[in-house]
Amino acid sequence: MAFTGNFMCTSFKQELMEAKHNFLASGGDTFKLALYDNNASFTAATTDYTSTNEVGNSGTYAAGGGALTNVNPSQPSTTVAITSFGVLTFTSATITARGALIYNTTAGAGTGTTDSV
């Protein structure tokens, strides 16, 4: 199945209500971005990072992806709140990626989690 669609994981929406994710630049959780080939199949029901169909190591890209740099959330209007991440680059990499998954490696209890965003 080809990699299709854009999703905000339903589990992430619930976890926001549980205050499980901290996006602050200072003291916030660690988020990573993993890259996937065209065989990856994610839906809104995706709950965790998986190595299945992740692209191979190349240059500075390694299994599990790269750590993102948190940017403090902001409220640009009365009805919108956003968060962002700094630019992530993988040098000397030759990769054919068709999609990505952002996930939290420190959600809730501290370390070792792989909750998808």
PLM feature segments, named:
Residues M1-R98, T105-V117:
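Small cysteine-rich, disulfide-bonded extracellular modules of the LU/uPAR three-finger superfamily
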